């Protein structure tokens, strides 16, 4: 499970893992699976079957609705229950991303082999991100300019930097 603010590298982690293993990444948006328990179960089983056929790594992006801590909402509880039941019998490598790690159901969290939390980059890390992405994009930018941008916008994520360099 990969948790953190948007743009901090969760999806990139799954992409890099799949590439390093020489496997395809099957990225699934939660909106594709539905929120009704019976629809979710069928859709998840289809996705896992595809991963098996393709030997793919699965990324379930923004999985918050399926991993949310159970409470008084019976439908939500059923969704989490279906998700748990389907996961229990799968062998595929699955990356789940969430922006709300504090709300993850304990039963889901206990089934995750690894849980990584991503923070907004520190100013020093942000400067390194600027340098690396600018160099990869062939954009000439001085270290002085990078320091000035970081000083004025210390909460930018890697995705923010990437998008700004496209301007």
Region spans (language model):
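C-terminal helical "lid" of AAA+/P-loop NTPase domains
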Residues: 150-151, 159-167
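Walker A/P-loop NTP-binding motif of AAA+ ATPase domains
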Residues: 1-147
């Amino acid at each position: 499970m990969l948790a953190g603010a948007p743009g901090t590298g969760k999806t990139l982690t799954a992409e890099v893992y799949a590439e390093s293993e020489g496997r395809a990444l099957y990225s699934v948006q939660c909106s594709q699976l539905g929120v009704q328990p019976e629809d979710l179960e069928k859709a998840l089983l289809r996705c896992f079957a595809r991963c098996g056929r393709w030997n793919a790594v699965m990324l379930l992006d923004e999985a918050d609705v399926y991993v949310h801590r159970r409470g008084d909402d019976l439908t939500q509880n059923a969704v989490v229950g279906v998700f748990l039941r389907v996961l229990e019998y799968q062998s595929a490598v699955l990356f789940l991303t969430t922006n709300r790690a504090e709300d993850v159901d304990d039963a889901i969290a206990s089934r995750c082999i690894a849980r990584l939390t991503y923070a907004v980059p520190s100013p020093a890390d942000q400067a390194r991100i600027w340098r690396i992405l600018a160099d990869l994009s062939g954009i000439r930018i001085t270290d002085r300019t990078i320091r000035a941008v970081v000083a004025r916008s210390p909460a930018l994520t890697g995705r923010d930097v990437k998008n700004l360099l496209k301007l």
